[in-house]
């Protein structure tokens, strides 16, 4: 769905998907975490997709300042959906931590370090992250490390 929304918007502006450079961070992290579902849940939805929660509001503000309300609305839809994606990853991460007898917040920090993962984007979208399952204490600890 997100691909179709973005592609439709790009086409309405005279472009298409693939016309602009993009990073492969999600795919690269998925490859790095092959074989460890706990690391995958920590670092794909809880880190990289959560970074999208943080990055979206500033991008929306820039689009709105440029008068591109249609693109900002597309990002509203995606942001709402991504909260659910991050939340699903959070629930699986916490379940797997419980199954392995691991404390989630320290495990998350350990995995960030072990995989040399990028840090959260600041300012963090705390409301979206809380809705997705992060605790206020965890957000405070992450903010200190950034």
Q: Which functions belong to the PLM regions below?
A:
Residues 1-146:
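Non-heme di-metal
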């Amino acid at each position: 769905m997100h691909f179709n929304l973005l592609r439709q918007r790009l086409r309405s502006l005279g472009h298409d998907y693939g016309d602009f450079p993009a990073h492969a961070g999600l795919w690269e992290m998925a490859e790095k975490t092959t074989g460890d579902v706990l690391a995958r849940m920590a670092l794909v939805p809880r880190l990289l997709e959560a970074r999208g929660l943080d990055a979206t509001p500033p991008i929306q503000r820039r689009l709105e300042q440029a008068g591109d309300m249609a693109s900002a609305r597309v990002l509203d839809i995606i942001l709402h959906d991504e909260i659910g994606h991050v939340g699903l990853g959070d629930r699986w991460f916490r379940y797997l931590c419980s199954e392995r007898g691991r404390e989630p917040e320290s495990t998350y920090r350990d995995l960030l370090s072990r995989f040399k993962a990028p840090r959260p984007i600041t300012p963090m979208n705390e409301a979206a992250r809380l809705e997705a399952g992060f605790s206020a204490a965890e957000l405070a600890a992450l903010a200190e490390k950034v």
